[in-house]
């Protein structure tokens, strides 16, 4: 039971019945789930499970039944309770066999126009099939923090206590180096 809260240990997999369920989802509507951004920032892997669905994170049109989440914390053990929010469900209307995504795509020309009105980035943006981003390893001076690495041994993170923790308790700063390069440990979270 998650009533009083439960600790989900890192490197373990849990399947939890969700409070939400669906009752006669119209056949013209399907749903797709994804982790909330805060879940990803904590390196917690989540997937939605619907009975008789052929894939994770999908709910077919016409579905009625319970929903479950597979939860696997990778870098930090987390505390959750009834009502904690780790995943989100997005509904899509199906039209003549084709899915109509809710949302829109902005063209490169529109992105350039937007940048002229309200700058999207400092300096000149790289716009090619969308706005391109890259990481900055050089820093403006040697020793400047350019990123963070998750600490291997930390206290538990209560996912419902937003902005309640000190960065230094969970993350180790990565300083810029004069060589302007960085070797990452593939078993760590950055």
Please identify what each model-predicted range represents.
Residues 1-190:
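DUTPase catalytic domain/fold
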